[in-house]
Amino acid sequence: MTSPGNPSGTVIAPHEMAALAAYCRDKGIRLISDEIYHGITYEAAAATAAALSDEAIVINSFSKYFTMTGWRLGWMVVPEDLVAPICRLIQNFYISPPTLSQDAALAVFDCRAELDGIVAGYRERRDLLLRELPKAGFNKFAAPQGAFYLYADVSNLTNDSVAFCERILDETGVAIVPGVDFDRERGQAYVRFSFSTSLEVVAGAVRRLIDWQKP
């Protein structure tokens, strides 16, 4: 499971995550929790599976909240019985992360105020999309609770999200992602917007979409 999620920005509530963890424990299922977008939330903080189950596998990264995309650095929290097997597996892929990446990661823990300011910027851009996208005909979506994506139902506009996104790119220069990249069954009716770029770029993109939809 992923919380906050990509592409929806949905955050799994603590009681729901606890129920999932209990179900997995009862059924002998290994729970893997992708928590890469932890720290980027707009309401309550996202719960971690590590607090709910000693048997869960938690995957996280410095790429999102810590803005270290490209440094290829992350971590796992695993049950004791998996430590040795995972270490053996990892040693077949790499020896260790670069020292430079590790030193940078240590330094970034002292940058919380700046990082939280970046999250506040995401919130501002999210709120702009929530206000302005309906003016461009994108009015069927749930407000993202975390991450920096908005997943919109465009079934009122198209039944082919790939062709729809290609047309928008060709005619407006705005790049959005077709839902089929995330959901092969229902993705033709959805698109994903990202608001990880600057406020000026997001605002300009929305203006183009509004103008594009005008009769």
Annotate each PLM feature:
Residues M1-P215:
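PLP-dependent class I/II
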